[in-house]
Amino acid sequence: MKYLNIKKALTAWQELQPLSEKDKDRLSRRFTVDFNYNSNHIEGNTLTYGQTEILLLFGKVIGEASLRDVQEMTASNVGLRMMTEEAKVKETPLTQNFIRTLHRTLLREDYTVYRNGQYKTRPNSVITRYGDRFEYASPEETPSLMADLVDWYNKAEQEGKLSPVELAALFHFRYIRIHPFEDGNGRIARLMVNFILTRHDYPMIVVRSRKKSEYLEALHQADLEVGPVPSDGAHADIKDIRPFLKYFNNLVATEVYNDVLFVSEKNENVWWYDGERIAFRTPNYTKILNAMRTEPTLTLADMREITGISIAAIQKLLDQLIQKKYVERGEKDGSWRVFMTQ
């Protein structure tokens, strides 16, 4: 079953409300890992999905990881919580100070990042996938363009002519065309998208790093329609960014639909990993996964006793789970870690 449009996905989501506390917690834990992993992975963070889960949910570092990547991921989660709390105060208008504070949180001094929380003082640009250099707003025009962006957002939100999805997509596009900071602009943009959706009681979404090319291509196609002048991009209209809006609508519909499935589907052989629904054809996978989650220190012989599956079959299934990075065995203590959720 697939939703043909975002309206159907949102209707299905609303029909599930109010969620139980258990389902809220399940969604929160899943989103925390998915969002932080993907948003940072897009920008080059090297922590694996499993490392991210253990770090954010249990406060531990497993395997080899750079200090910078660990600190970056931890700060990202602090920023996510800050954004979520701020979005709940719906009567408070958006301010530049909040965006700068969010940036300061993501790129703290212990990362030795230059000018965290302050707008750029030197030009920034990007080399596109097609080899072209694309210039963002100059340092001189950035403060006024950011003032325009925040003023436009608050006015547009009050007027209500744009849907929350249109508002979030257009804010993202305008913000990226300004690129106000010297680093961290993509991560801020993805946080602000969820800030806007949360303010309007929409589920939060994840831009998946495995689909980074689709994300960047949609922005590129919208750039072609708007043109290369930074101030034009910073003041773009919703009709000007049709390629990105189409992408964004599909993204929101897909993410909401997956949330609906995650909450409502009752199938013990269906698991989730980084936004993907994994339906195992045999219940033996579920037997093994549940056994490892219940008792992480199980040996193969223990698994055989609990599941009734032969050791040879268990080893084959484990090899497949490990290859997909759904599970991992600790090098020091030999305990199993399951990175799939239900």
Q: Can you describe what each PLM-predicted range is?
A:
Residues 1-183, 187-342:
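FIC/Doc superfamily catalytic core
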